[in-house]
């Protein structure tokens, strides 16, 4: 590698660090002193380098002239004594996003065991170029599905922090249905593409008939996709339906039926992006 190329690469690295520290100062300036902000920046850079939460490896990767043992003690003190404001973390992540809003959001829940403790987290993530970037979360003191109130609280936190205009649409799986939840999204006019079960009862406004969701799409063959042109009631809320026939994890063909606020013709391609949040969960689970 020639000298000019090396200088250019170093300059780019310096610029990235400058942007990082400037953003940290802007977001955390009222909550942290300068020394702690610099430490936090080193900590984030080390996390990106080693991609592990092992304190010893992180301390050894600090871009600093301080001894590893000293860096390790700083990490331990920081983790033990400092309570991070998750809203500030969300603002920090949001400020570093490489493109401008509106964003596609994915809502999902992940759970696992840490020793004998059940971990159950409701997560809202921004989907970007094949990645799901967690932006807000709620630790749920229970095992099982989230409630409508917990989902609404999480969405309201996002809206209060970043504004409803930064939302392109919301993607979610079959767990995230319910009349009050859909009513909230419709009232806020938040575009959504949410999967529903095949056996959901659907009410057709123009003739008053009630049918199963699968009735609209029973003719589909494997890998075919179709959307229903008319508006319908799902759980008492007006929305549009679309579906594709896919193979599930066991290789059995099934209907993937999606309820949408509008533009059901886009639901199939957009819903695929929801899988990024499940991939993110898989990578972040403890070994």
Feature annotation, model-predicted:
Residues 61-74:
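Short, basic interhelical loop/turn and adjoining N-cap
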Residues 72-129:
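Active-site-proximal, Lys/Arg-enriched surface segment
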Residues 2-52, 64, 89, 100-103, ...:
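Single, function-defining residue in the core of a domain
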Residues 52, 66-69, 83:
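Residues at alpha-helix boundaries and short interhelical turns
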Residues 61, 78, 287:
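Short acidic/histidine-centered micro-motifs embedded in hydrophobic/aromatic stretches
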Residues 58:
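Short alpha-helical "recognition helix" segments of helix-turn-helix
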